[in-house]
């Protein structure tokens, strides 16, 4: 999940706060998810709750308080950022299980040999530390068809799935499937056991990096910076209101541009069902024209998006 961070506008900040800062993540459909917030409350709430302290001058003073955090919406953010039509795609760093092993037992007499081979692999994997942590491996021994178990773990987004049968055990190989490459020639590989074990840490770290870079590239590709006048701004979002069956408009979702900072100008956005997501921390000193009023402006604001 890739995001932008900045300060909320006066109308979008938390009621009663002196300032609100947020992390805004772009979902695959172009909408913004406020993934986390931090509110500087000043002394407002301390006064109402009569919270005070003795300062350096040995005088009583109302406390300066904050309110901040993230919540379970991050789980939804991960799903909406990386999922595909087959289900979840979970980044290896946070996946409950980074490697899932599915025994493929076609004959009862093969079970002992297959399970003994899998236990050897599990033992070797136990010493692996992707991202500086002990690798998380799940052996799915449930009495269910292996194909059903594969699709269940695919829907759950397991980064790497191993399917190991008698032929693999006899050949000292593994059948490996990568979730992010599902349906591609690279998504299914037969590897020697030694190559798999030697490369699993690098593989998981590569998957993590590829997922991050894909989310970042999608975000950057869907931010317009070439809209520089109120007329172009209005025209863009009026055209973007035409939604097609799959839930998208064919238009990018975010616009980044100049704003004069006038709180009353946000009423223009309200009428258009658009919001200012944040005022990014990475500001430039260049002057421009406010996209809402046409007045001279220096403040760079970002993430206007269609509110359905």
Q: Where is each model-derived feature located?
A:
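NTP/phosphate- and nucleic-acid-binding module
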Residues: 3-308
């Amino acid at each position: 999940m890739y995001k932008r961070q900045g300060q909320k506008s006066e109308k979008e900040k938390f009621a009663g706060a002196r300032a609100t800062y947020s992390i805004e993540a772009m979902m695959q459909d172009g909408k913004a998810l406020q993934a986390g917030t931090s509110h500087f409350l000043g002394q407002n709430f301390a006064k109402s709750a009569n919270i005070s302290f003795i300062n350096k001058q040995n005088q009583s003073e109302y406390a300066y308080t904050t309110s901040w955090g993230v919540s379970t919406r991050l789980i939804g953010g991960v799903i909406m950022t990386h999922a595909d039509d087959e289900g979840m795609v979970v980044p290896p760093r946070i996946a409950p299980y980074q490697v899932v092993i599915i025994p493929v037992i076609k004959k009862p007499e093969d079970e002992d040999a297959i399970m003994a081979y899998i236990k050897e692999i599990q033992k070797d994997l136990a010493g692996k530390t992707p991202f500086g942590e002990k690798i998380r491996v799940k052996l799915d021994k449930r009495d269910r068809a292996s194909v059903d178990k594969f699709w269940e773990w695919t829907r759950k987004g397991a980064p790497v799935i191993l399917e190991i049968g008698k032929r693999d055990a006899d050949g000292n190989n593994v059948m490996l499937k990568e979730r992010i490459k599902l349906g591609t020639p690279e998504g299914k590989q037969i590897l020697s056991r030694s190559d798999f074990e030697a490369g699993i840490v690098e593989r998981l770290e590569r998957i993590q990096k590829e997922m991050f870079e894909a989310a970042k590239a999608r975000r950057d590709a869907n931010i317009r910076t070439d809209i520089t006048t109120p007329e172009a701004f209005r025209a863009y979002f009026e055209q973007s209101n035409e939604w097609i069956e799959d839930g998208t408009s064919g238009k990018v979702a975010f616009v980044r541009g100049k704003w004069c900072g006038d709180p009353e100008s946000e009423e223009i956005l309200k009428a258009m069902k658009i919001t200012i997501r944040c005022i990014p921390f990475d500001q430039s000193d260049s002057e421009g024209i406010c996209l809402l009023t046409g007045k001279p402006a220096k403040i760079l604001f970002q993430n206007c998006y269609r509110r359905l």
